[in-house]
Amino acid sequence: MDLKEYLEYVNQGKKVIAGSREHNFMHELAQEAMKITTALNNGYHEPDKIRELMSKLIGKEVDESFGLFPPFYTDCGKNIEIGKNVFINAGCKFQDQGGITIKDGVLIGHNVVLATLNHDINPNKRGDMQPKPIVIGENVWIGSNSTILPGVTIGKGSIIAAGAVVTKDVDENVVVGGVPAKFIKKIEE
């Protein structure tokens, strides 16, 4: 299996069966991601070097406007799309097997978790995983210690309050918060 074939498989939302070739390839990608994130996280790097390492991690060039404060963790890396003027603060953890799209102007606070996989609820198949993408619209601000769960789309201009657990799609230009996250108010432009 190669990367293209793997991404086509998971981006169709097909279940990853424990022990399958897709599952084994997922583990190969995790090993590569750990090597790159270890280099990223264990020492000081100028912004250009951070962008270079992040580009290597995701397999495509990040824009010169991209900013990241390490440490940063991911167990895949190759299914992340990052727009322009994106900033990711320290301690974030991205589980991107299901796909993460971060559009232009997004700000991501400290210790945010983006999780794109769920395990099977059947205890006899618990090792199986279901990928679902996360899409973060333009100019979204995700507050520190928030968790975004599989399949969530966050509409442009919205704010996710610190500590929120987002389980459902978020409309454009709103503030949501809480566990689970609920509507707080509309943002007037």
Region roles according to the model:
Residues 153, 167-168:
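Active-site/ligand-binding-proximal alpha/beta "capping" segment
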Residues 72-82, 87-153, 179-189:
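Flexible, glycine/small-residue-enriched loop-and-beta-strand segment within the central core
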Residues 1-65, 181-184:
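Terminal amphipathic alpha-helical/low-complexity segments used for targeting or macromolecular assembly
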Residues 116, 168-173:
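Short arginine-rich
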Residues 152, 173-174:
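Extracytoplasmic/periplasmic beta-strand context in beta-sandwich domains
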Residues 160, 178:
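Conserved G/P- and acidic residue-centered "switch" motifs that form tight phosphate/ATP-binding loops
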